Amino acid sequence: MTHFSQQDNFSVAARVLGALFYYAPESAEAAPLVAVLTSDGWETQWPLPEASLAPLVTAFQTQCEETHAQAWQRLFVGPWALPSPPWGSVWLDRESVLFGDSTLALRQWMREKGIQFEMKQNEPEDHFGSLLLMAAWLAENGRQTECEELLAWHLFPWSTRFLDVFIEKAEHPFYRALGELARLTLAQWQSQLLIPVAVKPLFR
C-alpha cells in the first residue's frame, strides 16, 4: 500500500504551507519562502499542474500598500477579531473557543501516538500551520499512517471552511494567493487519502 505522503513533494509542500501560515513573514522560517513565492519558477516545482498555478504566480507578485507584516498581524495576531481564526476548535467547538474539545481530542491522539511537537508558548496545537508542519514531520520520519490520520481526523474536517473564509477575508494579494494555494494542495491530498475524512459539524 503506497501512501501519497511518502512522496518527497508532500513533506516539502506541507512544510512550506505550514511555515507561511504559522510564522511571521519576516521570520527566519518564513522570509526565504516569501522570497521564493514572490519570484518566478516555484510553480514548476509545486506538486500541482502548472496551469492551475499560473494565476497564483501573478497574485503572489502583486504589490499592495499593506505590507506582508501588517497583513500577517491583521490575519493571525490582532488586536482586532481575526477574520478567519487558524485554530480548529474555533470552527469545531459550539462555543468557538480555543482549547476546545477538538483540541483535547488532538492532544489525546498525539499522546497515544507518542508525538511531541513544540508549540509557541501557551498556543493550542490545532493551528492550521502547525498541523501542516506536524504532518510534514511525520511523513519525513516514515510515519505515513499517523500523518494521514492527522489530516483525515484533525485537519481536513475544518480546513476547507477555514480556507474559504480566509481567502474571502484576506484582503492582501499574497495571503489570498497563499490561501488558494493551500486550498488546491489540500484538495489534491484529500483526493488521494486512503482513509475517510471524519465528518464533524462546523459552527462558523
Curated annotation (Swiss-Prot):
User: What are the boundaries of the signal sequence?
Assistant: none
Give its localization.
Cell inner membrane; Cytoplasm
What GO cellular-component annotations does this UniProt entry give? cytoplasm; plasma membrane
> Repeat: is it a keyword of this entry?
no
- One Pfam family here: Nitrate_red_del
**Gene Ontology BP term (one):** chaperone-mediated protein folding
Keyword terms, alphabetized: Cell inner membrane, Cell membrane, Chaperone, Cytoplasm, Membrane
Q: What topology in the membrane does the UniProt record assign? A: Peripheral membrane protein
* Ion transport keyword on record: no
Major localization class: membrane
Q: Name one GO molecular function term.
A: signal sequence binding
User: Gene3D superfamilies recorded for this chain?
Assistant: TorD-like
How the protein assembles, per its UniProt entry?
A: Monomer and homodimer. Binds to the twin-arginine signal peptide of DmsA and TorA, although the latter binding is controversial. Interacts with the TatB and TatC subunits of the Tat translocase complex. Also interacts with other general chaperones, such as GroEL, and proteins involved in the molybdenum cofactor biosynthesis.
State the HAMAP family in the record: DmsD_chaperone
**Family note:** Belongs to the TorD/DmsD family. DmsD subfamily.
For this protein, the record's NCBIfam families field holds:
PRK11621.1 (NF008632)
Protein function: Required for biogenesis/assembly of DMSO reductase, but not for the interaction of the DmsA signal peptide with the Tat system. May be part of a chaperone cascade complex that facilitates a folding-maturation pathway for the substrate protein.
What is the protein name stated in its UniProt record?
Tat proofreading chaperone DmsD
Which species does the entry assign this protein to?
A: Escherichia coli (strain K12)
Q: What's the encoding gene here?
A: dmsD
